[in-house]
Structures are given as C-alpha cells and as structure tokens.
A protein has these predicted regions:
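DNA major-groove recognition helix of helix-turn-helix/homeodomain DNA-binding modules
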Residues: 51-68
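Recognition helix of helix-turn-helix/homeodomain-like DNA-binding domains
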Residues: 34-49
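A short, Lys/Arg-rich alpha-helix, primarily the initiator
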Residues: 1-26, 66-71
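Non-catalytic effector/regulatory segments
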Residues: 3-4, 32, 61
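Short alpha-helix boundary/capping elements
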Residues: 32-35, 65
Length: 72
C-alpha cells in the first residue's frame, strides 16, 4: 500500500472506537461534507485539503490528544 500524505487515516486509527462517530460528525461539519462517502474520500486523501481544512482537522484531533495525523 502506498502512503498518501493527504490522508488522515493515521490519526483516525488512533481514536478510541467510541469517539469515531463524534469525530466524523465534527470533521464533516468543519469541511461542510454532506455524505459519509465524501468523508471517506477525504480521509483516504483522494482530495488534497485546503490549508484551512487541514488546520480544522488537526484542531479536532488535537482535542483528543492525537498529533500524528497525516499519512497512512
């Protein structure tokens, strides 16, 4: 598997299982995503995030003590 530097799967895999729905909802709101499919496309890094989007994603993960977010 190749590494995708725009993917935030690394951070996602560090989340406690009981927090994934909450974090998904928050990221979808921050990025104004309407469907889970678009969320997973973003999580896999198929679309490069804007700087403001990357900062939002980092801030959300940081609240859960996760700082190593990008790549997978």
């Amino acid at each position: 598997m190749t590494t995708n530097r725009f993917s935030f799967r690394n951070g996602w895999s560090q989340l406690p299982k009981n927090k994934t729905a909450e974090v998904r909802t928050r990221i979808m709101g921050a990025l104004q995503l309407k469907t889970r499919n678009t969320f997973y496309i973003r999580m896999r890094g198929e679309i490069e995030p804007k700087v403001s989007e990357a900062e939002s994603i980092e801030a959300i993960f940081k609240e859960y003590g996760i700082t190593d977010i990008w790549g997978y």
